[in-house]
C-alpha cells in the first residue's frame, strides 16, 4: 500500500481519513507500535466518526504483533494520559485529530518518555515502511476509566465558598461527554454551550486558539452574567478563557492568574512559556520576583521541559498548560479550568481584576502565512541574518524572536504545514505596526525572489 509520509508530523500522525489515513494504515501503526512497546499498550479514541474504525484496526495490528492491550474506549486525551498513571504503563495511543476539521483523524503516541515527537516519529515511519514487525498472539481487555478520572479531578479540586457561574463551550467535541458533568459535580453552575456531541462540528471548529471560535462564548458570558467562560478544544488538552465582561483572556494572561496564585509557595521559581507569549507576561512575572524562560512551541516540548526542569507550572500561547505542583505535569484543560475556578471561588476578585497592574502591549494574533515547504527555512534565516545585522536582541530557540525593548517580532516555521507563523507586539499600536512592517518587508522579499 502507498503511505502518505507527510501525515507523519512533528508531534503526531494526522491526515484526512480514507484519503491519507486509512484503516489499513491504522493496522500497520498498530503492528509497529506493538513492536516498539515495552509492557501493555493503553489505547483510547475521541468521538470522531472514523475513530471507532481506526481503533479497531489499530488493535488488530497490535494483537498480531503480540501486544497486551487495555482499550479504554471513548475518552479525552488527558484521560488517556491519566490512564498511564492509573495503570502504571508507559505506552499509550490516542486516536484523535484534536481541533482539526471533521474529515481528519490521527494518532498521538506515548512511550516511556511521554509524548513521542520529532525523530521518534520519523523512526516510527521508517519501521512501518520496513515492515519489520514482531509476530505474536496478543490479548485485549477493556476498561471504562470515566469514574476513576472523575474521582481524581474531584479529589484534586475543592472549590471555595463563592458560587461560580461558568459558560462552558465544548465545541461539540469529545469533552461534551465528560467535562460539563464533572464541573457540575465540583459545584460549578454550568451554562452549557455547544455541549452536544456532533463530529460534524456544526457551530465552530473546537479550537479556542482561533478568536472567531470564541465569539459565541463571549456573547453568552455577557448574556447570562457569568463569572467566566471556558472553552475546550476537540480532545480536551487545550483551554480558552473569557472574562466576566466577555473579553478574551489569552493563554499567557491565564498563566499569569495561575502564577499569581502559586508564586509565593511554589518550589521552582522559574516560569516557563513559549516564544509566542507577550512581553506583558514576562514583565509581570519578573515583577513577582520570578525567573522567566522561553521555551519552544509544541505540547511535546512543553511537557519535556516541565519534566526535565521540574517546573511547577508552564504553558504555551495555544492553550496547552501543564501543572506539576499538585498534578502530573501534562496538559489537561479540565484540570486547568478547575484550578482557575478554585482561585475565583476563594476570592471576590473577578477575572479582569488580575490584569489591572499588567503593562499594556498591543499584539497581533498569531498569523499563518503559506510560503511553501521550500521557503520556510529561507525566510527564517533571512530574518535572522537581518536581525543580526541590526544587532537586535534575538531569541532563536524556535525561529527568530526579536526583542525590541518596546515589543517583539516573532517568525517561526510551522511544524504542521507549509507555513510560517508570525506575531508582532508593541507598547503602542504604532510601534507594533512598525515592527510588523519592518519584518514583513524581509519576508516578502524572500517570497517574491
Question: Where do the protein language model's features map onto the residues?
Answer:
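Active-site nucleophile and cofactor-binding loops and adjacent substrate-binding regions
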Residues: 69-78, 248-251, 273-274, 295-296
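Gly/Ser/Thr-enriched, mixed-charge loops and adjacent short helices
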Residues: 105-224
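Glycine-rich phosphate-binding loop
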Residues: 92-98, 102, 221-243, 248, ...
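Phosphate-binding and adjacent anionic-ligand microenvironments
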Residues: 266-423, 429-449
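An N-terminal, well-structured beta->alpha segment
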Residues: 1-68, 91, 142-166
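N-terminal small/polar loop signature for handling phosphorylated ligands or for N-terminal nucleophile
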Residues: 41-104, 182-242
Amino acid at each position: 500500500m502507498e503511505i502518505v509520509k507527510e501525515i507523519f508530523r512533528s508531534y503526531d500522525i494526522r491526515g484526512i481519513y480514507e484519503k491519507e489515513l486509512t484503516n489499513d494504515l491504522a493496522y500497520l501503526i498498530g503492528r509497529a507500535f506493538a513492536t516498539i512497546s515495552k509492557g501493555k499498550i493503553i489505547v483510547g479514541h475521541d468521538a470522531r466518526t472514523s475513530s471507532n474504525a481506526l481503533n479497531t484496526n489499530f488493535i488488530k495490528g497490535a494483537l498480531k504483533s503480540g501486544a497486551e492491550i487495555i482499550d479504554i474506549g471513548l475518552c479525552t486525551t488527558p484521560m488517556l494520559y491519566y490512564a498511564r498513571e492509573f495503570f502504571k504503563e508507559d505506552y499509550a495511543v490516542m486516536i484523535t485529530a484534536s481541533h482539526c476539521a471533521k474529515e481528519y483523524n490521527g494518532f498521538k503516541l506515548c512511550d516511556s518518555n511521554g509524548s513521542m515527537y520529532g525523530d521518534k516519529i520519523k523512526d516510527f515511519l521508517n519501521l512501518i515502511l520496513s515492515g519489520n514487525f514482531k509476530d505474536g498472539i496478543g490479548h485485549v481487555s477493556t476498561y471504562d476509566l470515566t469514574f476513576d478520572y472523575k474521582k481524581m479531578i474531584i479529589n484534586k479540586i475543592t472549590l471555595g465558598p463563592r458560587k461560580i457561574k461558568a459558560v462552558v463551550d465544548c465545541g461539540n467535541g469529545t469533552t461534551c461527554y465528560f467535562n460539563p458533568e464533572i464541573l457540575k459535580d465540583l459545584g460549578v453552575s454550568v451554562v452549557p454551550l455547544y455541549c452536544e456531541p456532533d463530529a460534524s462540528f456544526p457551530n465552530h471548529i473546537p479550537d479556542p486558539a482561533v478568536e472567531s471560535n470564541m465569539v459565541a462564548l463571549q456573547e453568552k458570558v455577557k448574556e447570562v452574567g457569568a463569572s467566566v467562560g471556558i472553552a475546550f478544544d476537540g480532545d480536551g488538552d487545550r483551554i480558552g478563557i473569557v472574562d466576566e465582561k466577555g473579553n478574551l483572556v489569552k493563554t499567557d494572561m491565564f498563566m499569569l492568574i495561575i502564577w499569581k496564585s502559586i508564586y509565593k509557595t511554589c518550589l521552582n521559581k522559574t516560569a516557563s512559556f513559549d516564544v509566542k507569549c507577550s512581553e506583558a507576561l514576562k514583565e509581570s512575572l519578573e515583577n513577582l520576583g520570578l525567573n522567566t524562560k522561553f521555551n519552544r512551541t509544541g505540547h511535546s516540548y512543553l511537557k519535556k521541559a516541565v519534566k526535565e526542569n521540574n517546573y511547577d507550572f508552564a504553558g504555551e500561547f495555544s492553550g496547552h498548560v501543564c501543572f506539576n505542583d499538585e498534578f502530573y505535569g501534562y496538559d489537561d484543560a479540565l484540570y486547568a479550568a478547575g484550578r482557575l475556578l478554585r482561585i475565583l471561588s476563594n476570592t471576590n476578585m473577578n477575572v479582569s481584576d488580575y490584569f489591572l497592574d499588567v503593562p499594556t502591549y498591543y499584539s497581533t494574533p498569531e498569523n499563518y502565512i503559506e510560503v511553501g515547504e521550500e521557503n520556510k527555512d529561507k525566510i527564517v534565516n533571512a530574518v535572522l541574518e537581518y536581525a543580526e545585522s541590526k544587532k537586535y536582541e534575538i531569541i532563536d530557540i524556535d525561529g527568530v524572536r526579536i526583542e525590541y525593548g518596546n515589543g517583539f517580532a516573532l517568525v517561526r516555521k510551522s511544524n504542521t504545514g507549509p507555513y510560517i507563523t508570525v506575531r508582532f507586539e508593541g507598547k503602542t499600536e504604532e510601534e507594533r505596526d512598525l515592527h510588523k512592517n519592518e519584518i514583513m518587508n524581509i519576508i516578502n522579499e524572500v517570497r517574491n525572489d
